[in-house]
Amino acid sequence: MVSKKLLSFFTAICLVFGSASVLPNAFAGSETSITASAATVSGDYEYSVNEGFVRIEKYNGKAAKLTIPSAIDGKPVRIIGESAFKDCKSLTEVTIPESVETISDQAFYSCSSLTDVTISRGVKTIGSQAFFGCRQLKSVLVPGSVTSVEMNTFGYYSDAEGHWLSVKDFLIYCESGTAGYYNAIRNNYDYRIVAPVKRIAGTNRYATAAAISEENYTSAETVVLAYGLGYADALAGVPLANKMKAPLLLTNKDTVPAETINEIKRLGAKRIIILGGTGVISDKAVNQLKSQLELTDNNFMRLADSSRYGTAVRIADYTNPDPSELFFVFANNSADALSVSSVAAGMKAPIIYLNTDGEIDAVTKAYLASVKGKVKNAYVIGGNGVISDNMMNKAAAALGLTFGKTVTRVAGSNRYSTCTEINIKFAGCFTSSQICIAKGLDFPDALAGGTFSAVQSMPMLLADNSLNADQQSYLKKREYSTVCVFGGTGAVPESLVNKVLIASA
């Protein structure tokens, strides 16, 4: 965590020369070299098109909170033109999409009500006085993607006589050694160093799983394959994938996506472990794999039962027949299983599904009896509302343990706080200085994320559009070398990533 006020402006001048803060050996293209077509109107935007890319010329709307579109009329927005949002007094919050590379001179000049700006990690150049006169803007996070930012871009306004004044205590969040960092130095602003961001994403859940695999493995003998439209088998399979040093990839029921096929080819894998029965991954899909990968029946293994409870048991039995620890999670909630999957993998502990109340599934009950005397400690993830005390007393008894002593509950007030409590209780499992973020209300982009965080030995943070008090408190106590994000900006928006960075700065 770094917060510094430099001793003198002249010291800063010695560090960087010229009117713009530019990274060494980085040259930003000049948008003045583009000859655009005549302006066209789409909704509140006037825009021009050059070489298939959109330049926003003027915004005519009155929105207070605005996310600038990444595309207009099917063409990507690449440039926010000079003075495009000038004097937009209604604007209080704006998000600039990752499609944008250039924020031109005076783009948001004198947006006097603007308090919050999210600059996505596609932006490379920020022009002169782009945010001049935004007196209510007290801080900004300049991402590491920005290679050129003019000295007078942020933190200045003029009085009635035209005298330039500085916004009091203006603060820049930036990565060390970046253009934003040098901009803070040259302007003698306070600054705080944030971790770099690594976003691992594809165009869909299958491509994201393949991208996570590629990030983790240069090659692999084995691949674990799970159904991509459900979470139960995939998340129960994270400890197995970690044990086998295998990526976890996803498929449809009857057709294996090209992204998955291509990743298996890249890995050179010759063994595929299928999670779940033919109701989720059919023989038709297996035959496709055989044909396209030139494999035979001997290259496949299926771990399955008639339900998610039974499949989780089959996976557990194969992964570790003699577990000393075990995790219970609610069968109908992906969040808790996702939160604990990497921890379970690191501890070589199976993930077993339970209902909220009632009787324990017969297959699960038989499994618990089979590991009775082996399991010394078990953990139930989530509060009494997801797995009741009554159910836990039954599960503990089946293991020959006592709920409240050798079987303990790890829970917060909601899925986000439960995830935080997991990270605190099992902090010893995390040796990495990294942290990963996944969407809390949906599972697709993060299904394979558990294997990544297990291999990298990093905690998982579940969040959506904001951070609650428990998450902010957790982040403030820690520094991270990298923040990894699972999925695109539609799953985990840049505004949320920035909140994580700022909370831990």
Specify the residue positions occupied by each region the protein language model found.
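Short loop/helix-cap segments at secondary-structure boundaries that form the rim of catalytic
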Residues: 181-186, 287-288
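Long, low-complexity, intrinsically disordered polar/charged segments
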Residues: 132, 140-175, 213-224, 320-325, ...
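Structural signature of tandem-repeat unit edges
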Residues: 21-24, 44-52, 61-79, 89-102, ...
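Conserved functional micro-motifs across diverse proteins
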Residues: 55-56
